[in-house]
Amino acid sequence: MGTGIVFPICAIPFSILINVLFIKKEHADNYETKIYKLLIILNFIGLILELLCTVGSLIYSQHPIIASAIYKTYLIYLISWTGLFTYYVYKISINKEAKKIWKSLVGMISILSCIFVYILPIEVVIKDNFQTRYTTGASVTFTYLICSVLVGFIIMTLF
């Protein structure tokens, strides 16, 4: 095993703590709080998926379809989290009329992107006796592109 799993393993207890504290504490019951709750739950799911990517690397030579599904699910998590965070920023920053347009736009981008991620190819690179491992291919590049566009939308909101 590489050291790539150390950070997610260390982050899981903190993520659990944040989820438990948020759920147990009383807070304002508004839409922004509900989105935040989804963000912290998605974060925990993302940590689990990141650990599963290491498992995917271990089983890739015997079960490439299962491993690819794990990797692509992680990419979809990245798009989903970034899309939801983008919507959260718009929800707290933009007037009501613009919110409807941005909600539809970000929603469509996220949904279509998830479909494309599963369609596009992905490759796994494992080197140096499992010390270096990463994914590459059109699916990964597409995910980077979509997340960059969503972050660009967030930056545009600031101005």
What are these model-derived regions, one by one?
Residues 16-22, 84-90, 144-159:
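Alpha-helical transmembrane segments in multipass membrane proteins, preferentially the mid-helix core
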Residues 1-11, 113-158:
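Extracellular-loop-to-transmembrane junctions of the mid-late helices
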Residues 98-105:
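Membrane-interfacial entry segments at the cytosolic side of transmembrane helices
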Residues 26, 90-97:
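Membrane-interfacial segments
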Residues 5-27, 31-64, 70-88, 105-123:
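Hydrophobic alpha-helical transmembrane segments of multi-pass membrane proteins
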